[in-house]
Amino acid sequence: MSRYKLFIVDDSALIRLRLKTSLALWPEIQIVGEAENGQEALKKIPLVKPDVVTLDLEMPVLDGLSTLKELNKVYPVPVIMLSSLTTHGAKATIEALENGAVDFVPKDGDWNKVVSELKEKIKIAVLAKKRPKPFTGGTLNPKNVILGKNGRQLVVIGASTGGPPALREIIPKLPQTFPVPIVIIQHITRGFSKPLADQLARVSRLKVKEAEKDEQLLPGTVYVAPAGYTFKIDKQGGSLTAKIIEPVEYLPAHFYPSVDEAMLSAAEVTGSKTIGVLLTGMGKDGALGMKAIKERGGYTIAQDEETSVVYGMPKAAIDIGGVSRVLPLSAIAEEIAANI
C-alpha cells in the first residue's frame, strides 16, 4: 500500500501535535516533517519531498500566504490551507486558493470533523493531476464576439476542487455588457462564498455578489450561491429569481449548494435558453444537470482534462453524454460569450 507523505506547517505546537496524533491513526499517511513557521518550512520541504503540505494561514516570521507563494517557486507541491472562519481568515483563504492551494480546511470547531475533512482532502490533493495556476488575466476581444445572438437567458457554472482560480480565469474576461445573469455553484465551506464573490468582484467588470433569498437575477450580474444552502433557479412574475433554502437535514453525501440541483432547476425554468458550464472538481455533481440542460436544447461546456486540477465532475458529465463542447480553461469565457 502506498502512503501519502505529509508535511505539517503550523505555529501552534498543540495543533501540530493534535494533527500528528490524529493522522497517525490513518495507515495511508506518513508524516515526514513539520515546521512552526513558513521560513523553516521552505528550508525543510525540498529536503523531505512530501506529497502534500498542510499550511496554516496565520503564522509569525512568514505567514501562510507568503509561504505558499515562495513554495510555488522552490518546491511546487499540493497544499491544503488550514484557516480560521474569521472575515480576515476567509478572505486570505480565497486568495490562497487563487495562488495555487488545492483546497482548505477550517480548523475552528469540532476537531473530529476537522480531521475527517482533512483526511479526505489529502487524498484529493494527492490525486490532483496538477496544482491550480494563479490568474493570468486578459479580456475578450469584443470584435470577435457578438453577444446575445442565441437568445440565452441564463448561465450556470459549477465547480469544486480548483474552482476559485478557474472562475477567476473566466469571469474577469466577460464584458460589462454581458446580457444575462450568471450563477456560480462552487463547493465551499459555509462562510467562504461571500469572500469568493468579493474577490471575483475586485477583478471583474461584471457585478459579482453572493446571491440572496428570492432576489431577482439580473443581466450582467454574477451570483455566487451561498455555501451551506440548497440553491435553485425559480421564476416569479416572468423574472428569474434565486430560490435559497436552509436544509432541514444535511445529508452526508450531498452538496449544499448542489450543481445538479441548480442545473436541473435551470433546465426546467430556462430550458434551451440555458448555458451550463462544468469546471474542475472531484465526484459527479453536475453531470445529471448538464445532461438535462443539453437534452432541453441548451448548450453545455466542460473543462478539459489537461487544465482541470481534478477531472472528476467534467468527465462524469462527458461520460453520460451531457456535454456539447470540451475546452481548455483559457477558451471557456469566449465560448460562453459566443453562444449566449
Curated annotation (Swiss-Prot):
**Where found, per UniProt?**
Cytoplasm
Instruction: List every position bearing 4-aspartylphosphate.
Output: D56
- State the reactions this protein catalyses: [protein]-L-glutamate 5-O-methyl ester + H2O = L-glutamyl-[protein] + methanol + H(+); L-glutaminyl-[protein] + H2O = L-glutamyl-[protein] + NH4(+)
Q: What is its main location?
A: cytoplasm
Q: Which major enzyme category is it?
A: hydrolase
Query: Sorted alphabetically, which Pfam families does this protein's record hold?
Result: CheB_methylest (PF01339), Response_reg (PF00072)
Q: Which UniProt keywords apply?
A: Chemotaxis, Cytoplasm, Hydrolase, Phosphoprotein
| SMART domains the UniProt entry points to | REC (SM00448)
Q: At the top level of its lineage, which domain of life is listed?
A: Bacteria
Q: Which InterPro entries match?
A: CheB-like, CheB_C, CheY-like_superfamily, Sig_transdc_resp-reg_Me-estase, Sig_transdc_resp-reg_receiver
Keyword Zinc-finger part of the UniProt annotation:
no
The active site lies at S160, H187, D285
Give the EC number(s) under which this enzyme is classified: 3.1.1.61, 3.5.1.44
Q: Posttranslational modification, per the record? A: Phosphorylated by CheA. Phosphorylation of the N-terminal regulatory domain activates the methylesterase activity.
Q: Residue limits of the CheB-type methylesterase domain? A: 148-340
The GO terms this record gives for MF are: phosphorelay response regulator activity; protein-glutamate methylesterase activity; protein-glutamine glutaminase activity
Membrane spanning segments where?
Answer: none
The Response regulatory domain extends over 5-122
Work out whether the entry's keyword set contains Magnesium: no
Q: Which cysteines are joined by disulfide bonds?
A: none
Give the CC-aspect GO terms.
Answer: cytoplasm
User: What is the role of the protein in this entry?
Assistant: Involved in chemotaxis. Part of a chemotaxis signal transduction system that modulates chemotaxis in response to various stimuli. Catalyzes the demethylation of specific methylglutamate residues introduced into the chemoreceptors (methyl-accepting chemotaxis proteins or MCP) by CheR. Also mediates the irreversible deamidation of specific glutamine residues to glutamic acid.
Which family does the record claim for this protein? Answer: Belongs to the CheB family.
**How does the record comment on the protein's domains?**
Contains a C-terminal catalytic domain, and an N-terminal region which modulates catalytic activity.
Q: Which NCBIfam families match?
A: PRK00742.1 (NF001965)
From the Swiss-Prot or TrEMBL record, give the protein name. Answer: Protein-glutamate methylesterase/protein-glutamine glutaminase 1
